[in-house]
């Protein structure tokens, strides 16, 4: 049986990376929330 999680760095960054977050208003809100919370990593991309 094929597993549901088939990792791809490219897809991961395009969906959840920093530039993807910055591209939309809501994405920027996500970053603002994570900054306010004090997250060491804001997004999955390095």
Swiss-Prot record:
Pfam families, per database record: Ribosomal_L34
One BP annotation, GO: translation
GO MF annotation terms: structural constituent of ribosome
Keywords, in A-Z order: Ribonucleoprotein, Ribosomal protein
InterPro entries: Ribosomal_bL34, Ribosomal_bL34_CS
Superkingdom of origin: Bacteria
Bias (Basic residues) ranges: 31-40
Residue span of region Disordered: 27-46
Residues in coiled coil: none
GO CC terms of this entry: ribonucleoprotein complex; ribosome
Annotated family: Belongs to the bacterial ribosomal protein bL34 family.
Protein name as it appears in the record: Large ribosomal subunit protein bL34
Gene transcribed to yield this protein: rpmH
């Amino acid at each position: 049986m094929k597993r549901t999680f088939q990792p791809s760095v490219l897809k991961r960054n395009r969906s959840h990376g920093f530039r993807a977050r910055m591209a939309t208003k809501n994405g920027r809100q996500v970053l603002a929330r994570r900054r306010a919370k004090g997250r060491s990593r804001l997004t999955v991309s390095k």
